[in-house]
Structure formats: structure tokens, C-alpha cells
Amino acid sequence: MIIYNVTINIDHAVHDEWMKWMRETHIPEVMRSGMFTENRMLKVLGDEDSGGVTYSIQYTCKNMDDFQRYEKEFAPAFRNEYKNKFNDRFVAFRTLLEIVG
């Protein structure tokens, strides 16, 4: 199993709007891609001095083939939508993890 982890620091000024959009729009759209079996959103603790609130959004997929298909067919449009909606109000980085135990 593969976990696609997206860590996002979102500006306090747009936090509530972002949270609503993530829960009601973005995460459901990512899941509708059919490439992931589950997801979860976690708040990063101890990061209060970052100028925003930091979250880890984790999507689980069965294998690398599903992840690579997501990256090729779906991710570019999602990232573009994200950038257009929140522009310079967030910083994100992505990590790919493999469940080994």
C-alpha cells in the first residue's frame, strides 16, 4: 500500500474557506478519481509560528501504478485549481510513503 501525503500550510486569513472547500469539494473530487481507497486529514501540532495552520492530507492507494496514473491523469488539474483558488495563501509539499508493517 502507498500513502500519498500532502502537507499544506494555509494562511489564517483563508483557513475557514479552505477547510470547507477541502472537506466539501477537493477531497471528494480526489477520491472520485478512483485511484485512492481512503483518505484522512490530520492537523500538525507544534507548528504555531509558521504564519498559518499546517495539515497533512493522506490518500491511500493500492500500488504505484494507481499513484502514477493519478499523477498523470488527475493531479495537474487538481493542482491548477488549488493554485487558482488559494494562490499565494498556501505552501505545500508532497511525500510518497510505503506501508511496510
Stretches found by the model and what they are:
Residues 14-40, 77-81:
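Short amphipathic alpha-helical segments
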Residues 37, 52, 60-96:
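An amphipathic, aromatic/His-enriched active-site/gating alpha helix that lines ligand/cofactor pockets
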